[in-house]
Each structure stands twice: as structure tokens, then as C-alpha cells.
Swiss-Prot record:
Span list, region Histone deacetylase: 9-320
Primary location recorded for the protein, binned into one broad class: nucleus
Listed Gene3D superfamilies: Histone deacetylase domain (3.40.800.20)
Native source organism of the sequence: Strongylocentrotus purpuratus (Purple sea urchin)
Name under which the protein is recorded: Histone deacetylase 1
Active site residues per record: 140
Name of the encoding gene: HDAC1
Length: 576
């Protein structure tokens, strides 16, 4: 992989469960395409260059910041096995045909919305430059209505989050279908400008006319570029860059949301444009150059092998790295036959977008944008709390220390041994014969090899011998049996003894037994003061021997006349 352009901090949101959801037999929307994209990203090694997060599941409180309470409650309640009980609500909320009820519908909406909102929070905190959620970009969902395979409008929720920190947010839509749900949500405000390049005329959703420019305070803040069939890379580049340059000049946003619907690619199952991956990704590259917080989202795309190719290539574009045209082997390699290449070729369909037609639309849009006051501002106001707390898990555990979690949720928090865990020092040899990939098992193997090495064994033996020496206590003096018979009175001396200096009595150390440690203390010097002769019948005062450090205290005040200790005993005082 070669580096291209300026490096950006990129974070990427993906949940492994998102590919399990299934709209139904024959339905063109297949969430499995997101899993295929993720697998290509892994096998190209792009995951090493960005931060990967599992998105939280957006809760009802987050979804109802835009959608109505009744609609979100309905999505949370409806299931394939209870559809018959909600016939009226299904008609009211437009659920049933294009937007079917399937197993896990609400959880799918939670994951899609959670990734986009989490990316917006990350951008608000300036912890990343580009946030990616390919599971998002569902731009048709309305406030109280599903539409165009979309149930919850994650884009609107993400923009509402960005508006907490940014005065003006720019939304760009390069899906082949008009981004009607996002335009409708912000049609009357000047804080969000919506720009959509789409197929127009007898094509879903039928909105996005050149004359749809917004209303009220939002007048001229909706920009629609209607296109005809067959537009190619060259024509698309000639309209996208000039229009976006003018928008950036006049509006001066501080954050950008880019919906990267891949149904505008050549050969799409429901599309009729003729773009290649390079033409599609040029839009990402161009907006990246403005160095503003950028949120990339998915959207349409119904030839799933090309969707995976497109979003993988645009991930590499966001990262600023070049990836090979040869596809690496992956879990879905057979999907990409017969050429097994990354890039696709345009078809030979006719481009009905003539130069004259495109110039006419550009001129009209320039005139509308001249009506925009430069960089409209907003009054200062308190910043609301973020949708996602910094440490939500820790707070939940503190509030509910006894709350149990499901086995599935617990397993998701455990890193599997075979998960990718390469680090930046991959390839450096830490032990002979070992590479750089490290996981739980290789870590254990490495520790066991280190512990079994010869140097380690020698260190262990040295430490154990030192420990045994320290642990072995010094020989304690044994209790000396004392003679309790009172000493006979001394003979009377006619001459009075003169007071003199005290004499030193050296205690003779006991002889060592073979193999025994040295007796402690070795030479104990005890000063014995000389006293004058006592009167007849008096007894000699006892002499107290101070205990040595680390030995037990001997009996207090033993008589002076003690028998000679045994050889194993502690040294005793020798009497003159």
C-alpha cells in the first residue's frame, strides 16, 4: 500500500451482527454487503491504519430526537409473528412492501443509527478527522414514515448531534436517488445546507427538482442537481467540483456529512448511472481536502460485489493509501469473479447528460447561491449533552452492580484468540522463530518459552537459594534451667573492699554442631559492676542480659549462679 495525500485520523464503525439481517426473499436491499465490505477492508490490511469501533445500539430517546414517539414504538414492537395485530399502523407508517417487517428490524435500525451518531460525537470532540459508518446513510426515512428501504434516518440524527457544536453543517448526497428524507428534515433552516446529485424524472422518490430550494429561513439552502441516465466520471467531475467550490465559498460550513450511496455506480441493479469507483471516490477525495470534520456514510447499492469494492476503495481514500487492484483472498472471494479485480469498467451506455444541459443547471444553481448571505450565524447558546456519555459502561455498572448481562453480550466483550490483533511492531522478532502477530495463545506460548529458557532456570535457582537463606531463622537460645537454691552468704571480710571499675565477663560461645548455623550472638560482652560486700544474710542482685536482635526474650531476672549450658544452647555468662 502506497501513501497518497495527507494523513487523517480515521475511525470506523462496524458491528458483526449487521450482516445477519435479511429483508426477505428477492428484496434488493441486502445488509450482507456491509459484511463483505468489512471483510475486504480486513484483508487489504486497512484496519491497521484506523481505529475500529463497535457502535452502540441507539436507544429510543436518541431516535425520538427526530422521529415521532409512536413511530419508534411501532418499530420496536412489530415482528413477523405479530404483524396481523398492527395492520392499521403498518399502513399509517408505510411498512410492508418496500420496507418489510423482518426479524431484528428494530435492532438493525439501532446499529445503523448508533454508528452515525457515535461518529458525530467523535467528530465533535475532535478525537478524529473522518468518521465512517457504511451501515448508515439511510436517507429516505421520514419523521413518521418508512420509505425506500429506510426506517430510521441516521443521517438526520447525526447532523442534529453535529449541530450541538457546529453553527453550519453541509450535507452532500451522491446516491442515485434524491436524499428526500434529509432535505425534508432541514428544509426550513439555514443551519444545514443539503446538496444532492441524483437521477430525476419518473424515478424514485420523484423529488429533487431544480426548483426545490428550501422555504422560510431555509430558502436557497436546498441545492438539487437533477441528472439524466448514463452520466460518466468525466461529466460528474465537471459538475461536482465547481458546484461544491461555490457552496463552500458561500456557506462556509464547519462540518460535512457525505452520503456515499453506491447505486450510482455502473452496473447497479437499480441504478442507471455509469460511474466507476475512481469517479465516485473523487467526491470523497475532493471534500477531504477542505480539512473539516467529515462523516462518511453508506446508502444505496444493490449490486453487492460492487458496493463492497466501492466502500473499501473509499475507505482507502479516506486513509490516504493506495491499494492494489488485485483483490486479496477473502471469505467472499467467489463473489468478485470472473476477474477478481478491485476496479470496475464503465459500460457502453449513452450519456444523456449533454454539456449544454449540465451548464444550464450549473448556471441556475449559481444564481440561487448568490442569494445566500455569507456564512449565516447563530446566537450563542448552551451546548447540550452528548448523545453518548464518555464512560457509559462504567456508569451503568456503578448504578446496577448486580445487573446481569446476556451471554451473547458477555461474549462480545471477550477477545477471541483468532481475532486480528496486529500492532505497529508486527514482523519484529521477539523470540527466535516467532513473527509479529500476537494473540492470546501466542502470548502464553511466549511466556512459557521464556520461563523454560536456560537463563531463566538459573535465575530461578539463584533466587530460590537466596530466599531459603533469608527464610532460615537464626538459632534461638534455649531456656537455661536455673538453680532456685538460694546462694550461701559470703564470708565476712575484715577489710572493706574498695569500690573499683566494673569487670568485664566474657561469655564463652557454645561449640557448633556439624551442619548447624552459627550461634548468635557470637561473643557477648556483659559489664558486671562490682559492689561492696552485702551484709550477712543478704543475696546478690540478679543481672539482666539484654536480648539480642531477632531472638526470643529470655526469662527475666535469672539468678547469677547458673549452671553451664549444654553445647547446643545459647552462650551463658561465666561467673568468677
Amino acid at each position: 500500500m502506497a501513501s497518497t495525500g495527507t494523513k487523517k485520523r480515521v475511525c470506523y464503525y462496524y458491528d458483526g451482527d449487521v450482516g445477519n439481517y435479511y429483508y426477505g426473499q428477492g428484496h434488493p436491499m441486502k445488509p450482507h454487503r456491509i459484511r463483505m465490505t468489512h471483510n475486504l477492508i480486513l484483508n487489504y490490511g486497512l484496519y491497521r491504519k484506523m481505529e475500529i469501533y463497535r457502535p452502540h445500539k441507539a436507544v429510543m430517546e436518541e431516535m425520538t430526537k427526530y422521529h415521532s414517539d409512536d413511530y419508534v414504538k411501532f418499530l420496536r414492537t412489530i415482528r413477523p409473528d405479530n404483524m396481523s395485530e398492527y395492520t392499521k399502523q403498518m399502513q399509517r407508517f408505510n411498512v410492508g412492501e418496500d420496507c418489510p417487517v423482518f426479524d431484528g428490524l428494530y435492532e438493525f435500525c439501532q446499529l445503523s443509527s448508533g454508528g452515525s451518531v457515535a461518529g458525530a460525537v467523535k467528530l465533535n470532540k475532535q478525537q478524529t478527522d473522518i468518521a465512517i459508518n457504511w451501515a448508515g446513510g439511510l436517507h429516505h426515512a421520514k419523521k413518521s414514515e418508512a420509505s425506500g428501504f429506510c426506517y430510521v434516518n441516521d443521517i438526520v440524527l447525526a447532523i442534529l448531534e453535529l449541530l450541538k457544536y457546529h453553527q453550519r453543517v453541509l450535507y452532500i448526497d451522491i446516491d442515485i436517488h434524491h436524499g428526500d428524507g434529509v432535505e425534508e428534515a432541514f428544509y426550513t433552516t439555514d443551519r444545514v445546507m443539503t446538496v444532492s446529485f441524483h437521477k430525476y424524472g419518473e424515478y424514485f422518490p420523484g423529488t429533487g427538482d431544480l426548483r426545490d430550494i428550501g422555504a422560510g429561513k431555509g430558502k436557497y439552502y436546498a441545492v438539487n442537481f437533477p441528472l439524466r441516465d448514463g452520466i460518466d466520471d468525466e461529466s460528474y467531475d465537471k459538475i461536482f467540483k465547481p458546484i461544491m467550490c461555490k457552496v463552500m465559498e458561500m456557506y462556509q460550513p464547519s462540518a460535512i456529512c457525505l452520503q456515499c450511496g453506491a447505486d450510482s455506480l455502473s452496473g447497479d441493479r437499480l441504478g442507471c448511472f455509469n460511474l466507476t469507483l475512481k469517479g465516485h471516490a473523487k467526491c470523497v477525495e475532493f471534500m477531504k481536502q477542505y480539512n473539516l470534520p467529515l462523516l462518511l456514510m453508506g446508502g444505496g447499492g444493490y449490486t453487492i460485489r460492487n458496493v463492497a469494492r466501492c466502500w473499501t476503495y473509499e475507505t482507502s481514500t479516506a486513509l490516504g493509501v493506495e491499494i492494489a487492484n488485485e483483490l486479496p483472498y477473502n471469505d467472499y472471494f467467489e463473489y468478485f469473479g470472473p476477474d477478481f479485480k478491485l476496479h470496475i469498467s464503465p459500460s457502453n451506455m449513452t450519456n444523456q447528460n449533454t454539456g449544454e444541459y449540465l451548464d444550464k443547471i450549473k448556471t441556475r444553481l449559481y444564481e440561487n447561491m448568490r442569494m445566500i448571505p455569507h456564512a449565516p450565524g447563530v446566537q450563542m447558546q448552551p451546548i447540550p449533552e452528548d448523545a453518548i456519555p464518555d464512560d457509559s459502561d462504567a456508569e451503568d455498572e456503578a448504578e446496577n452492580p448486580d445487573k446481569r448481562i446476556s451471554i451473547m453480550a458477555q461474549d462480545k466483550r471477550i477477545q477471541r484468540d483468532d481475532e486480528f490483533s496486529d500492532s505497529e511492531d508486527e514482523g519484529e522478532t521477539r523470540l527466535p522463530g516467532e513473527g509479529g502477530r500476537r494473540d492470546h495463545r501466542s502470548h502464553k506460548a511466549k511466556r512459557s518459552k521464556i520461563d523454560d529458557s536456560p537463563g531463566k532456570e538459573a535465575d530461578k535457582e539463584a533466587k530460590s537459594s537466596d530466599a531459603s537463606k533469608e527464610a532460615k531463622p537464626a538459632a534461638e537460645p534455649q531456656a537455661v534451667p536455673m538453680d532456685t537454691t538460694p546462694a550461701p552468704p559470703p564470708k565476712k571480710s575484715e577489710d572493706k573492699p574498695e569500690a573499683s571499675k566494673p569487670t568485664e565477663v566474657k561469655a564463652k560461645p557454645a561449640e557448633k554442631e556439624p551442619g548447624e548455623g552459627e550461634a548468635s550472638p557470637a561473643d557477648l560482652v556483659v559489664p558486671v559492676p562490682k559492689v561492696s560486700a552485702p551484709s550477712e544474710g543478704a543475696t546478690l542482685p540478679a543481672v539482666t542480659i539484654p536480648p539480642s536482635s531477632g531472638t526470643s526474650q529470655p526469662p527475666a531476672d535469672p539468678p547469677v549462679s547458673a549452671p553451664t549450658p549444654t553445647p547446643a544452647s545459647a552462650p551463658a555468662e561465666k561467673q568468677d
